[in-house]
């Protein structure tokens, strides 16, 4: 709606969405659902024929550090160390600094990869397990993110995902901007 109020045509908006958004979904069915939802949302504003760049690919296998994104919004998979295969554990240990020690969760690698995919001044908002702020094995991750962390929105106690009991929070991050204060908000 904002782009329309600025006088941009539906065609121009559709082209911009096609060129400036990239997404990753490893599950083909979920990828298709994502595109359908995006199309429905755009249709509400009269925007059609967006050629979505939603890749059916593992984000961690993509050369994300080459993206230099302005914004990253995500909800990484919540897979515990216990639920990973030995092959997955070894891959993450070899490729991600925050996964070299202890019993890391899969989402730690996503957070590191996303930070590396940001350009300087780029911002990230991730919906993450709240346990990251308490878990002993998340210490390396906390060290990694603390410099650019701008805020935490604590959703503990909220039923964010139907049928799933997991306390979550939004992590707000800005690359290259060290903060002496971090916004903390409870919902």
Where are these regions (language model features)?
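Conserved SAM-binding motif I beta-strand of class I
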Residues: 20-25
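Short basic/glycine-enriched coil/helix segment immediately N-terminal to the Walker B
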Residues: 12-18, 65-68
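Signature of N6-adenine DNA methyltransferases within the class I
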Residues: 4, 26-35, 45, 49-51, ...
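Short Gly/Ser/Thr- and Asp/Glu-enriched loop/turn motifs at secondary-structure junctions
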Residues: 16-19, 49-51
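Conserved SAM-binding loop of SAM-dependent methyltransferases across substrates and taxa
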Residues: 1-16
